[in-house]
Amino acid sequence: STAANANVIFKGSGWGHGVGLSQYGAKAMGLDGASYEQILKRYFTNIGITGLNETESSSFIITDETPLSVGILQNSSTVLFIVQSGKAQLCFDQSNFCVGTANPGETFRFGAEEIGKCAFLRVNGDKSVTKIGTSGNCSASVIPTSVKTEIFIPYKARSYKSGILRFRERSDSVRINTVYELGVEDYLKGLSEVPDSWPLASIQAQVIVSRSYAVWKALQRGEE
């Protein structure tokens, strides 16, 4: 009889896309003593691992403090937000003019008053609203004044910090897209791809892959 082949190959991707790093494969390699370089080179062939400062030194990825944009809401008529801690400036980007300051615990609504004109409205305790300053172009921002500033978006039931909340009018309507701009390292703090109890090398490999993917997508999109 013919001896069985000693090598067995399994193919599959579980519920994922099957491309790139396998988290559980990285965990197994980490438990087996592999370094993060060895883990990465197992899943990505012909690669080098280089710092961003060396490969993108003149790119907006390095020169812009908040080069990454994370979509929060699309095609909404208004956006409700609450300043949970710290303070933030309410600004219109086209005129580079800030109409007021949002204080801790205050609730605001941003939306269109007419075609091409939007306003910040403070929502009072009795549900009435107070317009903050004058109206402006619908490209606007909520800019934190300190590292403690945290902004809550009720529709998403999530809080955001270490970045800038941006509103952008859609080109095809008076409705608004909302994004959160932040730095590469601050973006990585929000990831939870693998538990922190996993081997350090496995976590390091995941961080490098996540950083590389985020930067690649940002470079594809280009600077705003």
Model-based region annotation:
Residues 1-224:
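Conserved, single-site charged/polar hotspot
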